[in-house]
Amino acid sequence: MIKLIILLFLVFLMLSCDSSNHIRTYHLPKIHHTNNETLQTKSQKPQLSGFTWEKPGSWIPSQGSSMRIASFDVPFSTGMGDLSVMELGGEGGGLVANVNRWRGQIGLEPLEESEIRAQAQPGESEVGPYQIFQFINDSNSDAAMLAAIFPMNNSTLYIKLTASKDGIMDLEKDFKTFCSSIKRNTNN
């Protein structure tokens, strides 16, 4: 009986050893982009999700989350910032909730609505008026942000630039120019 158990164990052991658990490598052909695709990537006026804009030539289109309409790596004198463009339905959570969430992301305490409204800088673009907010964490010079909120009929457009304090100071003018250039794409 013991010989049968040992024999069954050895058979089981040999059958369970399979080469399919080894690492496999595959070679895939490289995807070549046409000239037209390359030009669209470098376009100064992208037409994504119903909006167009003009960006500074130094801004580099980048991968962002699936929620973003667009993402850019934004170089400045001592580093790189991250700019995101997002559109959310309705009020997208509301002014107070969004501003206080952004403040929390850089280590700042929440504010009351009256304080938030007092800090808003007005702006104007072809899609309508918007508000810009500047957040700088004085205890952490690497934590700063510019954010713009564009309320529209059925949605809200958000543009957010995160960088260091120096980056925000360097990029503020370009950020405001970018926000003012936002237009609805009439080809949609």
Give the ranges of each region predicted by the language model.
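N-terminal targeting sequences that direct proteins away from the cytosol to non-cytosolic compartments
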Residues: 2-6, 15-81, 88-94, 100-105, ...
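Short, Gly/Ser/Thr-enriched beta-strand-loop segments that form substrate-interacting elements
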Residues: 126-144
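Flanking scaffold residues of small Cys/His-coordinated metal-binding clusters
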Residues: 9
